[in-house]
Amino acid sequence: MKSFFAGAFILIISAFNSIYAQQFIDRVNFFTDTSLINATLTLNIKKILAEKEKEGYIFPATFSCKMGDSLNVNDQVSVEVRGHFRRTYCYLPPLKLIYKNNPAAAFYRLKSLKLVNTCVPTFSNDQNLLKEFLIYKIYNLITDKSFRVRLLNLSYKDNSGKKKTITQHAFLMEDIKEVAKRNNCADWTGKKCNTESTDRRQMTIVAVFEYMIGNTDWSVPVNHNIKLIHANNDPMSSPFVVPYDFDYSGFVNTSYAVPDERLGIESVRERVYRGFPRTMEELNDVLDIFNKQKANIYATINSLNTLTAETKSGIIDYLDDFYRTINNPSSVKRTFITNARE
């Protein structure tokens, strides 16, 4: 009889553990799933607007959504105000959702996720947000050493009842430690390094990609809009560059994006290559990646139903110009060698 009850108890505990385990969101599948998540972030909007100048300010919130057909998420989370320019300029600042302090949260295994939202809740800014989301998805096609993202239709609900609910698109970004882990790497904890001290081929991929999207708002030496990771099996090897934050790119073309006057261009839509010179052989090796992924890139753009036909057409026209450049040998030499950084 004792053995019967002992066995029954074990079965009950096993079943409970199985059910409990199923409540956690898988940190890998979360970003491989491409479906749109309808979610609500309940917080004190009035307070966040009053305190948004305080970078690192943390306050409580509730993140709710439905995952698949069965899991209703209602996580208590800590929300941190982050960002620099967008934190001060935009109506709602960028946030970080922190789950690691709540083991009962469905998103616990994802630890913390950056939340990227529209600058001001208007239709044009919503389209810009979707364009920045697309940039991450496109870069995923170019290299695995990239941040993965998940699109949300997000409602900001004020728990004080003093502000109207705001609904807009937003996206969640993978943590850099997860980027490193799935690439058999670790987060770089060494000193800041010069551009040419990073992995040469990966740096070439990054520089060409930034040129592709018309983005000059990045710098390796000052860790501006880039993260570094290094190979686990060789901590002394050159680190790999992982870019992020693309709202200043010509691809997105936000109203607040203005180029550095030292670049000699009038609009962020004008491309400037910010990489260092490479041999034609090195360039052809990297440009071949972009050419092989062209059809997939264009398919990714056209498959995003939340973008208008006009927005898609503008993006494709902008990328067509890039592809004309990289498939013209004289343009390749002029752009990536002659006019490269010294």
What feature does the model see in each segment?
Residues 22-342:
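Phosphate/dinucleotide-binding and metal-coordinating scaffold of catalytic cores
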Residues 1-23:
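Bacterial Sec-dependent N-terminal signal peptides
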